Amino acid sequence: MDGLNGSFDKTEFDLASAENTTIENAPTDTTAFGISGGAITKDQKIGTITVKITSDTSDTTMVKNLEDLRGAFENDGKAKLNNDLNGAYEMLTLLSGKDLEFDLNRKTLSVESISLSNDGNETLTLSNGTIGCYVQMNGRAEQHLIVDNCTLNGLGDNNNYSDVTLRDCVIMKDCFTSYGGIWKFEGVNNITGTMKVKKDVTISGDFTLGTLKVPMVTTGTPTLKLSGNIRIGTFSFDSVYREEAKIVCGAGTYNFKPDEYETGRYGGIQLAEGCTVSGPDENGIYTVTAE
């Protein structure tokens, strides 16, 4: 129409399958239509909106049931969860040499366990949803578990020097590292339960934690490296805690004194090399800066 311009703020939608759903529960999305121009006050039809619906021809596997779920873990590639899925007794294994990117699609996946193979170099990525499971990795440095933007109802792993990255996650129950796991927490992380540290862990970004427990360590010199905005409610040390196990605080802000454990026990908390601490401020926050 002369004298009038119009546009949508979003012209394409990627919707989950509506198969086996009622109309009122079918997936939806919205877009806004804006108009401008000198003819905006005229009272007449401005045009026709055409909606084209096409099937998804990508290489992403839609997971609707346990059979689809097993197939996704038997094959590499990409998968997306179509609906909430409960596999309480389902023990999933990612096969040797396979990589899987699994988009939980804001849905909930509940399974008994997920494991990586005994001899492979797999990368498993879980993103954008809620999951409750036990993850078992099997001691190869080439294995990677990446959990991105997820709520975790308990995450533990039997893990020997494999690599685990948690990014922008909320963990509702206990989270622990065991048998040499190398963990990296990035972005915004909120653990409402207890985090138990046995081996090397690196945390960077905004991190909120109810209880941090450093348990008995019988070998090695595990280090917990912190940087970013760190808020920890309670520190807990096992009775046989070794002085060699260090908590190292880098640049960032802390709600505890980051250069000593305030009860004086073992002196397990220290500043990273080249850092200084100031504070606390009126809110009890200490600031660590790198020189």
Which role fits each region the language model picked out?
Residues 1-74, 78, 187-188, 204-206, ...:
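Extracellular/surface-exposed low-complexity segments
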Residues 1-6, 11-13, 18-21, 26-31, ...:
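Solvent-exposed loop/turn tips at the surfaces of repeat/solenoid architectures
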Residues 61, 92, 112-114:
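Generic detection of short hydrophobic beta-strand segments and adjacent strand-loop junctions
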Residues 66, 77-100, 104-110:
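N-terminal extracellular ligand-recognition/capping segment immediately after the signal peptide
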Residues 71-76, 94-96, 118-120, 140, ...:
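Flexible, charged surface loops at secondary-structure boundaries
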Residues 94-98, 197-198, 219, 282:
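A short, compositionally biased
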